[in-house]
Curated annotation (Swiss-Prot):
Broad class of where this protein is predominantly found: nucleus
Family indicated by similarity: Belongs to the Mediator complex subunit 1 family.
TM spans (from-to): none
One GO location term (cellular component): mediator complex
Any GO MF annotation of the entry: transcription coregulator activity
One GO process term, biological-process aspect: negative regulation of transcription by RNA polymerase II
Protein name listed in UniProt: Mediator of RNA polymerase II transcription subunit 1
Organism lineage: Eukaryota, Fungi, Dikarya, Ascomycota, Saccharomycotina
Localization, UniProt: Nucleus
Provenance organism: Candida glabrata (strain ATCC 2001 / BCRC 20586 / JCM 3761 / NBRC 0622 / NRRL Y-65 / CBS 138) (Yeast)
């Protein structure tokens, strides 16, 4: 019960610090540091300047505060470890030649509250908590806390050195026996990811450190990049929900073309590396991600799918009239093969770093192709139809999944402003051919057949045979009185079905229905817009795929909207 009380109290304090961070005064900064468990004290350097020194196991921060002007004058960060090359500058400002690139100083001078500084302090404390240092009691002479602070710096350092890992940050030293310094790894991770993008993605993306005076690695598209560009995603560390979870040091190797762990002792416990897609969710405009695109253990904070209408929900309805001037009617075909989930954060620990490019490419595909088409379709739906759609979703348990082929579910509602036509079946349904009793033969069954002297067939013979459905009898099948011959021929039929069992086939019956439907309507020939999670096609414009060049995506959407306008 006490643990639950402390946990809830910690959450409340976190909310207060986030939503009511307080004004920037030396007293509030001191209280903020103390609330996080950092040792802090204030020294009076002269009549005007007070120096707040705060420290934990590794970090030592000096903040010089001008009491007369009520402003922060300088902030310095040093690390009590052998690695003291941690970058706390705004890379974009540094590249632009701005001398004020110190993000700790900027977060205390460029804002009205402590919110930005609180974020940066939490990030540093997180790295401090889960980092291992080779020597806690070594601070190089270059790591002095500045002029006029030699005595104070050494006393604070001595206090920090006496703190054990368990007492300093709540992490059991027996659990974290790894040798990973997260400060060093975070500094080098930018270089590794940029090399990965250069060699695996044709330099399509680039990583910039510490944007908008916040710690983190921000990922941009290389083409058209500028300081005003909006990042696609950001990479940062976060406490793991499973305290015993290990985080290993994975680096990108140009020799192998993959992410590798060179030393199994370089790990930390209780921390995750997060990739967060930069997307401003609203009630009707959210970021959707295909559920089966990456392993589900990467998903963090998956939201309720039914809170908003999905892309595939809208596309399930057959016909819409788009464009008030031309009254263009098109047929929409839903060919989605997976559910879309509302999620923006992914756990890219360890070898999952290899999936960064796939997630980013999907993000661009969604923003460039699926999202504009989705918003265009939503804008064409009247309020009455919107209520019908939401009612259909609410009354159906397994709506719009690959397995659901209920014709009633796929029917579109009546629209007084748009042309709707009901479909008898879902267009281009993907299904698997059934094997005998929906059961695949095992290896042991093949051995039994051989022992009993039953006829066997090679893979080549099976592939060469004409495919037949289980419920159809081929015309050329001669059933003789010879049971062995009959069994062998029957095996040939079943074997052929087994081989084709994994093939994703187009339902020919559904296609025939679609062809007949497409010829109906006022004009007698209604163009078809087919959309799934990685492919879009439209009659007369061709198609574009997730695997095509990005320029083709934009050109296809532009041409498609010209048809709608």
């Amino acid at each position: 019960m006490a643990d639950q009380y402390v946990e809830v109290l910690g959450d409340l304090i976190g909310l207060l610090k986030d939503y009511k961070p307080g004004t920037i005064t030396i007293e509030n900064i001191t209280k903020l540091c103390q609330s996080m468990g950092l040792e802090s004290f204030i020294d009076e350097l002269d009549n005007d300047i007070s120096r707040l020194s705060t420290a934990s196991k590794i970090i030592v921060i000096d903040i010089d505060y001008n009491k007369t002007q009520s402003t922060v004058q300088d902030v310095k960060l040093v690390l009590a470890s052998n690695f003291d090359n941690f970058d706390y500058s705004n890379e974009q400002l540094e590249e632009a030649g701005d001398k004020q690139s110190n993000i700790l100083l900027n977060s205390l001078t460029n804002y009205d509250s402590l919110k930005q500084f609180h974020h940066n302090l939490e990030f540093l404390y997180l790295l401090d908590t889960y980092s291992s240092v080779e020597s806690d009691n070594q601070i190089s002479s270059g790591n002095n806390l500045g002029s006029g602070n030699g005595t104070n710096g050494s006393s604070l350092t001595n206090k920090t050195d006496k703190k054990s890992v368990s007492s300093g940050n709540g992490l059991d030293s027996k659990l974290n026996e790894g040798k990973l310094n997260l400060f060093k790894y975070f500094r080098e991770l930018k270089k590794y990811i940029n090399t990965f993008f250069k060699e695996s993605c044709d330099n399509r993306f680039k990583v910039v450190a510490n944007v908008d005076n916040r710690f983190g690695l921000y990922i941009y598209e290389t083409h058209g990049y500028s300081m005003r560009s909006r990042p696609l995603a950001k990479v940062y560390f976060e406490r793991a929900k499973v305290p015993q979870q290990r985080f290993y040091e994975y680096i990108y190797s140009s020799e192998t073309g993959s992410w590798i762990n060179e030393n199994s002792e370089n790990y930390s416990v209780g921390v995750n590396l997060i990739l967060e897609v930069n997307f401003d969710d609203t009630d009707e405009d959210v970021f959707w991600f295909p559920k089966e695109f990456v392993p589900t253990d990467l998903f963090i904070d998956e939201k309720d799918q039914l809170t908003s209408r999905k892309v595939s929900d809208v596309l399930c309805h057959a016909f819409y009239e788009l464009g008030s001037s031309k009254k263009q009617t098109i047929e929409l075909m839903n060919d989605f093969t997976t559910d879309l989930i509302q999620i923006r954060r992914f756990n890219i620990n360890n070898d999952n770093l290899d999936l960064i490019a796939d997630i980013l490419n999907w993000t661009i595909w969604y923003r460039t192709v699926l999202r504009p088409i989705y918003l265009k379709l939503v804008s064409s739906i009247s309020d009455d139809d919107d209520q019908h759609i939401r009612a259909d979703i609410a009354n159906t348990k397994d709506e719009f999944t690959v397995e659901n082929t209920n014709p009633e579910i796929m029917k579109g509602p009546t629209n007084k402003n748009a042309s709707f036509m009901q479909r008898n079946s879902m267009s281009l349904q993907r299904r698997r051919r059934s094997s005998n009793k929906a059961k695949r033969p095992s290896m042991s069954e093949a051995v039994v057949f051989k022992d009993e002297g039953l006829q066997q067939f090679s893979l080549h013979e099976i592939m060469a045979d004409t495919t037949t459905e289980p419920d159809q009898k081929p015309d050329n099948l001669n059933i003789s009185n010879n049971s062995e011959s009959f069994i062998g021929q029957q095996e040939l039929m079943e074997g052929s079905n087994i081989i084709n069992d994994d093939k994703m086939d187009i339902d020919e019956e559904a296609i025939n229905d679609d062809d007949s439907d497409s010829q109906s309507g006022e004009e007698g020939n209604i163009p078809v817009l087919l959309v799934n999670e990685d492919h879009v096609s439209f009659k007369g414009l061709g198609s574009c795929s997730f695997y095509d060049d990005k320029d083709k995506w934009a050109k296809f959407v532009e041409d498609l909207f010209n048809v709608f306008s």
